[in-house]
Regions:
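Electrostatic, structured charged patches in enzyme active sites and in nucleic-acid/phosphate-binding
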Residues: 2-309
Length: 309
């Protein structure tokens, strides 16, 4: 999908102020919020309603997740994030899912990312549970079986892989282990690699940096009329490659040259990172924007993530 098409979707994203949340110091933006509402009743009628809506179907920009942030009675952090891989809004149901998504979305290996992927038909997961002697999750009132989901199904050039994101402490709970065992059996039958990802495998510093970079999606629309994003970006990149000036100084010079509002110079840097026009920045460490760069063309030391998929 072209960048211009992706940027058009940006207005659909609800931006909020960053807040501190637990020990991770970050509530990821782009729609992140703490949800607390009543869950819709789950029964046969609700199931067929979601099926008729096309939930869990489609690929790329046409995919519809089985669960959206509007469906859950969650008290955790949920997010809506515009993805660069698919050009659509992704529904992420925890801060760990959001962090992991940023890492997946930045990977050159990812061709498609489908979150909240339903394990259908539901009769199959019920049969798996019965075979394993495990209780299948059901609504406590209607007793209708819940449709189980896998957090992410990622398409690569080698095929699909499935990933479930869980806190390591959750893995000690019997009911969590049972649900994961059903998942494992479901994907094993399809000969698709399935793995569990915990907070121990997620590079949170890289996710934070990527979240910061992603704020520049609508950069072309931020510029004054008559000023082209490509022209400003080329000017910034020229200074970046030919001088050892700190990023902040290049940003200020860019603002002076084009008469931009304060802050847009730094947004130009973010935009260049988003477009992967600055290849040598290590996103696994805090970005140094104020020091003199020792090597021309180096931003410090973006390596784009090639793990987990």
């Amino acid at each position: 999908m072209a960048t211009s098409d992706i940027v058009k979707n940006y207005n659909k994203v609800e931006i909020i102020t960053l807040k501190y949340y637990n020990s991770y110091d970050l509530l990821f933006a782009f729609g992140g919020k703490i949800m607390a509402k009543h869950r819709a009743a789950w029964n046969c009628r609700r199931y067929h309603k979601l099926v008729n809506e096309g939930r869990g179907l489609g690929i790329g920009s046409d995919y519809k997740p089985w669960i959206t942030i509007h469906d859950l009675a969650s008290k955790g952090v949920v997010s809506r994030v515009l993805g660069r891989t698919t050009g659509r809004i992704h529904h992420l149901l925890s801060k760990n899912e959001t962090a992991f998504f940023y890492i997946l979305d930045a990977s050159e290996k990812a061709i498609d990312i489908r979150e909240q992927f339903p394990l259908l038909p539901v009769t199959e997961t019920v049969e798996i549970a019965e075979r394993l002697g495990i209780r299948h999750p059901r609504d406590p009132v209607s007793r209708y079986p819940y449709v189980m989901t896998t957090d992410f199904v990622i398409t690569t050039s080698q095929g699909n892989v499935a990933r479930s994101v869980k806190l390591s402490l959750e893995l000690e709970k019997t009911w969590v282990q049972e649900k994961l065992e059903i998942e494992r059996a479901y994907w094993e039958k399809r000969d698709i690699e399935w793995r569990i990802v915990t907070e121990k495998e997620i590079d949170y510093q890289k996710a934070r940096n990527l979240e910061w970079v992603y704020r520049s999606w609508c950069y072309p629309q931020m510029l004054p009329d008559g000023i082209l994003a490509g022209e400003v970006a080329d000017s910034f990149l020229d200074l970046f490659e030919k001088t050892s000036l700190p990023i902040t100084e290049i940003a200020r010079e860019t603002e002076r040259t084009f008469g931009l509002e304060p802050g847009l110079g730094l947004t130009t840097f973010q935009y260049l990172l988003l477009q992967k026009q600055i290849p040598a920045v290590n996103l696994s460490v805090p970005l140094d924007l104020v020091s003199v760069r020792l090597e021309l063309g180096k931003g410090g030391s973006v390596s784009w993530i090639e793990t987990y998929v």
